[in-house]
């Protein structure tokens, strides 16, 4: 009776059975994932620094130029026409120009870099396509809504007095950006903490010294 390749390998060695030796087999390259992890660390660190600078430092300093009034971007629960009217009365042209410049610099860089970092985080940790797109949705929406909110807030404070509809839109965008930022952070945690089987990550089967998996022995 003819012997199987596994039996031949056990008796005469892997070479006799035509099975490549595990020691000589090329190991799977981990360079792409290592490069991705390095990019992720750099992008995430930049996003955290920008968040701290933009929200905690720069917008706080802008409040000092508005008689202590909170900037609309920092009002998690939204705002009304009365608050915008108070801001318009308290801020001169120089202060409004500084806020607009802040929106165009740090206020633009933060959502873009945060979005890139979170997309990469999910890409590296989730292989199941439908789950990946589900987790990608909040950071994509956050970046779009945050950029739109910057324009809406600048429009409220510059030019003629805004109507109630403009204020309601800008307020809704502000609330939405904070909600989406929170959902994005939750999605990032899920991408890392969910079980590998849920994320579609298939563990590599251990290979024995004869190049045989556990199932073939």
Task: Please identify what each model-predicted range represents.
Residues 119-159, 215-217:
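Hydrophobic alpha-helical transmembrane segments of integral membrane proteins
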Residues 7-29:
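N-terminal intrinsically disordered, low-complexity tails
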Residues 31-35, 92-102, 127-134, 162-173:
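Membrane-interfacial loop-to-transmembrane-helix junctions in polytopic alpha-helical membrane proteins
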Residues 100-121:
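Hydrophobic alpha-helical transmembrane segments
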Residues 142-196:
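Alpha-helical transmembrane segments of multi-pass integral membrane proteins
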Residues 199-217:
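Short, highly charged, low-complexity non-transmembrane loops/tails of multi-pass membrane proteins
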Residues 30-71:
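N-terminal signal-anchor transmembrane alpha helix
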Residues 56-100:
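Extracytosolic (periplasmic/ER-lumenal) interhelical loops and adjacent juxtamembrane/interface segments
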């Amino acid at each position: 009776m003819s012997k199987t390749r596994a039996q031949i390998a056990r008796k005469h060695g892997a070479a006799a059975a035509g099975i490549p030796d595990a020691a000589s087999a090329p190991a799977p390259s981990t360079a792409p994932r290592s490069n991705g992890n390095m990019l992720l660390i750099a992008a995430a660190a930049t996003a955290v620094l920008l968040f701290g600078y933009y929200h905690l430092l720069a917008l706080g300093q802008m409040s000092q130029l508005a008689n202590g009034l909170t900037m609309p971007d920092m009002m998690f629960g939204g705002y009304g026409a009365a608050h915008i009217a108070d801001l318009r009365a308290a801020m001169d042209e120089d202060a409004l120009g500084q806020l607009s410049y802040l929106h165009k610099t740090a206020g633009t860089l933060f959502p873009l870099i945060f979005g890139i970092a979170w997309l990469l985080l999910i890409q590296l940790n989730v292989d199941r396509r439908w789950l990946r797109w589900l987790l990608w949705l909040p950071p994509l929406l956050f970046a779009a809504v945050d950029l739109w909110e910057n324009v809406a807030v600048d429009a409220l404070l510059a030019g003629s007095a805004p109507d109630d509809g403009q204020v309601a839109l800008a307020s809704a965008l502000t609330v939405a950006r904070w909600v989406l930022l929170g959902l994005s952070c939750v999605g990032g945690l899920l991408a890392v903490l969910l079980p590998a089987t849920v994320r579609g990550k298939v563990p590599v089967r251990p290979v024995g010294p004869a190049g045989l998996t556990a199932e073939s022995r």
